[in-house]
Amino acid sequence: MSEVKKIATRESYGNALVELGKEHDNLLVLDADLAAATKTSIFQKEFPERHIDCGIAEANMIGIAAGLATCGKVPFASSFAMFAAGRAYEQVRNTVGYPHLNVKIGATHAGISVGEDGATHQCLEDIALMREIPGMVVINPSDDVEARAAVKAAYEYEGPVYLRFGRLAVPVINDNADYKFELGKGVVLREGKDVAIFTTGLCVSETLQAAEKLAADGIDAKVINIHTIKPIDEDLIVAAAKETGKVVTVEEHSVIGGLGSAVCDVLAEKAPTLVKKIGINDVFGESGPALELIKKYGLDAESIYKKVKEFVK
């Protein structure tokens, strides 16, 4: 068996920016002294005159990005999720969100898989913070192919976009000729009739593996990748819930305010359904190797399999 190709979506971000930069002179990239980590250094090397290092001043970076947007530029402001969504939240809300400016926020190192950097750098709340800002699009791609497509879609969309990327290399699962990325549209990766599992980001590949284990036990799981958490694919959520009668959500984020909450918001109004949310259960993270943390917090394939099996019984 050939080895599965793995790429960190932060790498995809840097590479996609270069691809877009070659086509669009109005694209600028801002960073806050973390270009080597966010991988905007790839763009910086290719287009040094269009890369702005704002230093360790994330709030200022967002303000600069907002100003550039008013001048017709398309700025991608980049930092770790903890700083882009956390430290700079007020500026994102009031300077970008309120006037609905065409600013893109590239947030890397999101979730528990930041690993050894520990709880202070593991942003488990960013989706919740960003999806509540009126007019903000929130995207959490699952692999290299989807991340590149998401960056392109963000550029083409007129308005603020929050892009969530990871530090850890993840399997490429969308490497097929018919793959198509559409903002606000979920992707059915596996058909099933017993339970619908909605997942996003890093957890997509783990959920697919869990579904195979469930199938061996006679549980037919439908797996749906929700790359765009806002606007969310309400029609697909309702249809899958009605088809299976049981719903599970899986995310590398707090169970409060993230994908699980977004799915429940839809179902509460349109198709009340029993839901099991799998994610970080209202706790902070900790320092440790990323793969060990993913397992400890129950986001690996084996843990997902066990939780879904217990829920469906």
Q: Which sequence ranges carry the predicted segments?
A:
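Thiamine diphosphate
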Residues: 1-164, 169, ...
